[in-house]
Amino acid sequence: MEYTTKTQIYQKVKKPMLERQRRARMNKCLDNLKTLVAELRGDDGILRMDKAEMLESAVIFMRQQKTPKKVAQEEQSLPLDSFKNGYMNAVNEVSRVMASTPGMSVDLGKSVMTHLGRVYKNLQQFHEAQSAADFIQNSMDCSSMDKAPLSPASSGYHSDCDSPAPSPQPMQQPLWRPW
């Protein structure tokens, strides 16, 4: 017969109890995570998922939240996209009303739709020109700032702003650069 100490008996009892407590904590946290993701996504479908699916969904959601740069760019283009969508809906409505109006001249309909298309194209060109002007203005603001003097040991790539340093040759058009 094997002799067991009080410590060994205590460990035999304590280990399963600690495991149950750990699992209970994990389940509670998973339930909290489910409700948080459901609230933030506005989707109650996650509440009916099993634990593995819910964790996968939460990871995907967190990755989407992790990219603030993309979100900021989307937020900047959101009003323009909203306007474009509204404009196109209005153009479609005009087209539908003109097509359903008895006695409407086809030539008049074509000229109205051509005009609306030209206005839309002009608005897009204006927005692109405005974006380019903003980029140029930001570049000029950064290049006019006082730069710290470079030491001979430096790499030569020092800049106090995010935009690239102006090149020595004159540029006719601003070049788009991904940084």
Curated annotation (Swiss-Prot):
<comment type="function">
    <text>Participates in the control of cell fate choice by uncommitted neuroectodermal cells in the embryo. Transcriptional repressor. Binds DNA on N-box motifs: 5'-CACNAG-3'. Part of the Notch signaling pathway.</text>
</comment>
<feature type="domain" description="bHLH">
    <location>
        <begin position="10"/>
        <end position="65"/>
    </location>
</feature>
<dbReference type="GO" id="GO:0007498">
    <property type="term" value="P:mesoderm development"/>
</dbReference>
<dbReference type="GO" id="GO:0048813">
    <property type="term" value="P:dendrite morphogenesis"/>
</dbReference>
<keyword id="KW-0804">Transcription</keyword>
<keyword id="KW-0539">Nucleus</keyword>
<dbReference type="InterPro" id="IPR003650">
    <property type="entry name" value="Orange_dom"/>
</dbReference>
<comment type="subunit">
    <text>Homodimer. Heterodimers with dpn. Transcription repression requires formation of a complex with a corepressor protein (Groucho).</text>
</comment>
<dbReference type="InterPro" id="IPR036638">
    <property type="entry name" value="HLH_DNA-bd_sf"/>
</dbReference>
<keyword id="KW-0238">DNA-binding</keyword>
<dbReference type="Pfam" id="PF07527">
    <property type="entry name" value="Hairy_orange"/>
</dbReference>
<protein>
    <recommendedName>
        <fullName>Enhancer of split m8 protein</fullName>
    </recommendedName>
</protein>
<keyword id="KW-0678">Repressor</keyword>
<dbReference type="GO" id="GO:0046982">
    <property type="term" value="F:protein heterodimerization activity"/>
</dbReference>
<dbReference type="GO" id="GO:0010629">
    <property type="term" value="P:negative regulation of gene expression"/>
</dbReference>
<dbReference type="GO" id="GO:0005634">
    <property type="term" value="C:nucleus"/>
</dbReference>
<keyword id="KW-0217">Developmental protein</keyword>
<feature type="short sequence motif" description="WRPW motif">
    <location>
        <begin position="176"/>
        <end position="179"/>
    </location>
</feature>
<dbReference type="GO" id="GO:0050767">
    <property type="term" value="P:regulation of neurogenesis"/>
</dbReference>
<keyword id="KW-0221">Differentiation</keyword>
<feature type="domain" description="Orange">
    <location>
        <begin position="83"/>
        <end position="116"/>
    </location>
</feature>
<feature type="region of interest" description="Disordered">
    <location>
        <begin position="146"/>
        <end position="179"/>
    </location>
</feature>
<dbReference type="InterPro" id="IPR050370">
    <property type="entry name" value="HES_HEY"/>
</dbReference>
<keyword id="KW-0805">Transcription regulation</keyword>
<dbReference type="GO" id="GO:0001227">
    <property type="term" value="F:DNA-binding transcription repressor activity, RNA polymerase II-specific"/>
</dbReference>
<keyword id="KW-0524">Neurogenesis</keyword>
<dbReference type="Pfam" id="PF00010">
    <property type="entry name" value="HLH"/>
</dbReference>
<dbReference type="GO" id="GO:0042803">
    <property type="term" value="F:protein homodimerization activity"/>
</dbReference>
<dbReference type="GO" id="GO:0043565">
    <property type="term" value="F:sequence-specific DNA binding"/>
</dbReference>
<dbReference type="InterPro" id="IPR011598">
    <property type="entry name" value="bHLH_dom"/>
</dbReference>
<dbReference type="GO" id="GO:0048749">
    <property type="term" value="P:compound eye development"/>
</dbReference>
<dbReference type="GO" id="GO:0000978">
    <property type="term" value="F:RNA polymerase II cis-regulatory region sequence-specific DNA binding"/>
</dbReference>
<dbReference type="GO" id="GO:0016360">
    <property type="term" value="P:sensory organ precursor cell fate determination"/>
</dbReference>
